[in-house]
């Protein structure tokens, strides 16, 4: 068997490098990493160097441009496109979008999926309804949520791709007297298992477990390959997302007529 060592870089490029150095001092068999890649840059050259010395490196979720390491990634574009299309199909036009800024590859792909779905439906979402900031910027996140919740006409749907959003969002909506999902239809990624409390949930395919197992299996394959590592492999999981309603719920009145597909679902 293997012993698993866990570390958290807190999105710090310097800390990530220090942690990797510390792990290498234990003569680790391989490195599984969600790499830092943003305003500070990335440790791309260092990760490539580690792999070149014979230590397998498998990147997960966040793809660094031009990296020469194995990677297992989620198709963030399709996921966000399908979530946005679901909202627009239900007839909602006054919507809000929350996500990480388009600095990392996932943020870029998600924003592109959102915009492409809106373009397909001929919908223009005003900039004041779009929040793009890292999860660490809790002050801006709170300000945005309280602003949209207290407008004369608040959004009828909020598409969220920011991690750890359950408590902050629900608190903002509740303080403004808004109900979920009767007044605001919440949807998106990483809902921290909040939505089932309101009678529905988001189904992710592949599941987090399936995705994690794929990354672990690739890592083991590389460890068992020894020093003769094959060319890096880039595995992309096409991700599908859709709401699953566990019971009959009342959603906000649509701004436009729902499409035929949504009418059949109901």
Say what each PLM segment does.
Residues 1, 18, 79-83, 105-124, ...:
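Short, solvent-exposed amphipathic alpha-helices that sit
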Residues 1-85, 149-150:
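Alpha-helical recognition/docking segments in bacterial nutrient-uptake
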Residues 70-97, 112-116, 138-146, 166, ...:
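Hydrophobic alpha-helical segments within soluble ligand-binding/sensing domains
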Residues 81-121, 231-250:
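An alpha-beta-alpha
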Residues 145-265:
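Flexible loop/turn connectors
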């Amino acid at each position: 068997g293997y012993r698993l060592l866990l570390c958290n870089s807190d999105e710090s490029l310097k800390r990530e490098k220090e942690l990797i150095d510390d792990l290498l001092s234990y003569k680790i068999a391989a490195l599984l990493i969600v790499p830092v890649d943003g305003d500070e840059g990335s440790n791309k050259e260092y990760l490539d160097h580690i792999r070149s010395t014979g230590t397998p490196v498998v990147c997960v979720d966040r793809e660094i441009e031009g990296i020469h390491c194995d990677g297992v990634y989620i198709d963030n574009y399709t996921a966000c496109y399908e979530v946005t299309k679901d909202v627009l199909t239900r007839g909602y036009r006054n919507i809000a979008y929350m996500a990480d800024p388009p600095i990392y590859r996932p943020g870029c792909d998600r924003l592109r999926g959102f915009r492409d779905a809106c373009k397909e439906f001929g919908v223009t979402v005003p900039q004041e309804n779009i929040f793009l900031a890292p999860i660490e910027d809790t002050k801006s996140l709170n300000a945005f949520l309280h602003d949209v919740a207290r407008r004369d006409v608040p959004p009828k749907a909020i598409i969220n791709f920011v991690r750890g959003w359950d408590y902050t969002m629900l608190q903002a909506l509740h303080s403004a007297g808004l109900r979920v999902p009767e007044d605001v239809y919440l949807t998106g990624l990483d809902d921290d298992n909040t939505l089932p409390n309101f009678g529905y949930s988001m189904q992710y395919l592949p599941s987090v477990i399936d995705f994690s197992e794929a990354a672990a299996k690739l890592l083991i394959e590389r460890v068992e390959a020894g020093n003769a590592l094959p060319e890096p492999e880039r595995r992309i999981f096409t991700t599908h997302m859709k709401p699953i309603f566990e019971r009959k719920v009342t959603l906000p009145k649509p701004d436009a007529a729902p499409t035929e597909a949504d009418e059949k679902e109901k």
